[in-house]
A protein has these predicted regions:
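Short, compositionally biased strand/turn segments
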Residues: 1-9
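Acidic, Ser/Thr- and proline-rich intrinsically disordered linker/docking segments
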Residues: 9-75
């Protein structure tokens, strides 16, 4: 199973479940809390999955998008 690690211990999502990568904004905090339970330190991006969950990431959005694009292209 190909997993995208989001920069926090134990927090990964399946590449196949990624729907979008957003820049972090405080207005997304409520959605992050619903998915993860709290807003961790150093959030730079938010990964939206096909089930509508908003997951925090300490990676920059461009880094996540590059890794996601490589996975979609077959590596």
């Amino acid at each position: 199973m190909d997993l995208l690690w989001l920069g926090y211990d134990g927090l990964s999502v399946r590449y196949a479940d990624v729907k979008a990568v957003l820049f972090y904004r405080p207005t997304l905090d409520g959605r992050i809390v619903r998915a993860y339970g709290h807003v961790p330190a150093n959030v730079r991006a938010v990964v939206v999955t096909t089930d509508g969950a908003f997951w925090p990431s300490s990676w920059r959005p461009d880094q996540l998008r590059q890794r996601w694009a490589l996975w979609r292209g077959g590596g």
